[in-house]
Curated annotation (Swiss-Prot):
Pathway: Nitrogen metabolism; urea degradation; CO(2) and NH(3) from urea (urease route): step 1/1. This is Urease subunit beta. PANTHER family: UREASE. It is an enzyme of class 3 (hydrolase). One of its GO terms (cellular component) is urease complex. Belongs to the urease beta subunit family. It catalyses: urea + 2 H2O + H(+) = hydrogencarbonate + 2 NH4(+). Keywords: Cytoplasm, Hydrolase.
Length: 104
């Protein structure tokens, strides 16, 4: 082995393979400026200019790689994949009314 050498595994890596369920959702930015939503944001708490079924999205985040985001341009609908938030499923909140524990 050479110091700093990296050995890669063989085969493909399936993103969010442990997700128990997946949803597809249509989201449209009804605002006048672009909105970006990061990979681990509890989707119902995302920018209020985004129009989608927030009740159905409760407990879900975007199905995208960690540390990335999706940009929603004004007036352009997008279909995005969603996966359940993992871990302890606690959301401290991005708003004044955080949901707290998702599974009560």
């Amino acid at each position: 082995m050479i110091p700093g050498e990296i050995f890669y595994g063989s085969g493909d890596i399936e993103m969010n393979a442990a997700a128990l369920s997946r949803l597809q959702m249509r989201i449209i930015n009804a605002g006048d400026r672009p909105v970006q939503v990061g990979s681990h944001v509890h989707l119902p708490q995302a920018n209020r200019a985004l129009s989608f079924d927030r009740a159905t999205a409760h407990g879900y985040r975007l199905d995208i790689p960690a540390a990335t985001a999706v940009r929603f341009e004004p007036g352009i609908p997008q279909i995005v994949g969603l996966v359940p938030l993992g871990g302890r499923r606690e959301v401290p909140g991005l708003t004044l009314n955080p949901p707290g524990r998702l599974d009560r």
